[in-house]
Amino acid sequence: MGTMMRIGLTGGIAAGKSTVAARLKQLGALHIDYDALAHQIVEPGGVALPQIVAEFGPDALLADGTMNRPWIADHVFGANAAPGARERLDAIEHPLIYAEAARLEHEHPEAAIIIHDIPLLAEVIDDIPFAFDHIVTVEAPVCMRLDRMVEERGMSLEQAEARIRHQSSEEERRAIADIVIDSTHPLPEMLAQVGEIYAGWCAGR
């Protein structure tokens, strides 16, 4: 039996990363979803919430004990953001997310292949405390991603364009990846490619 293999999976919003992640999970990989972890730590009782309130003040919390997402969106990411607000929030959340990812790895010693599904991997690659055996990026043209965001996620075109602008570019993601998956291919063809990649990882362990 070989050792565990750790894979970084990334891709721009609406590029098809979730489809690739779902297929890898079906094939037997342990899937660690960083978006899910980011939501988990700011739920009522979550480890990040008290630190966020201490850093940004009581306006960051709603009366029902949940995070005030519209306020955070405006004061950390939006027009009313103070200088360095995004970095202050990241400094709270990122170490907690990494710690939770490490805990999940530790809880599954049987996992042969572990997928760290990280939308912003290119942005955090220098700080993340994990070494990856491979990094996969999933790509699609911006026009296709915009269509998906408007038609499938109910965003306005302006919202969709803003979300893409605030992420790293395809070139930046390609620079850290050794495997590129093009999600413009027909779905069966793309899933077959994912299966071939996974089989290669299993054989290489």
Curated annotation (Swiss-Prot):
All residue ranges annotated as the DPCK domain in the record: 6-205
| Annotated metabolic or biological route of this protein | Cofactor biosynthesis; coenzyme A biosynthesis; CoA from (R)-pantothenate: step 5/5
Which InterPro entries does the record match to this protein? Answer: Depp_CoAkinase (IPR001977), P-loop_NTPase (IPR027417)
What EC designation does it have? Answer: 2.7.1.24
Q: For this UniProt entry, what's an example GO CC term?
A: cytoplasm
Q: Which residues bind ATP?
A: 14-19
Q: What class of enzyme is it?
A: transferase
Alphabetical UniProt keywords: ATP-binding, Coenzyme A biosynthesis, Cytoplasm, Kinase, Nucleotide-binding, Transferase
Q: Where in the cell is it found?
A: Cytoplasm
Regions crossing the membrane: none
The record's section on Pfam families has:
CoaE (PF01121)
Which reaction is catalysed here?
Answer: 3'-dephospho-CoA + ATP = ADP + CoA + H(+)
Q: Which SUPFAM superfamilies match?
A: P-loop containing nucleoside triphosphate hydrolases
The alphabetized list of GO BP terms reads: coenzyme A biosynthetic process
> Which Gene Ontology terms cover its molecular function?
ATP binding; dephospho-CoA kinase activity
Known NCBIfam families for this protein? dephospho-CoA kinase (TIGR00152)
Query: In which family does this protein belong, per the annotation?
Result: Belongs to the CoaE family.
What role does this protein play? Catalyzes the phosphorylation of the 3'-hydroxyl group of dephosphocoenzyme A to form coenzyme A.
What is the protein's given name? Dephospho-CoA kinase
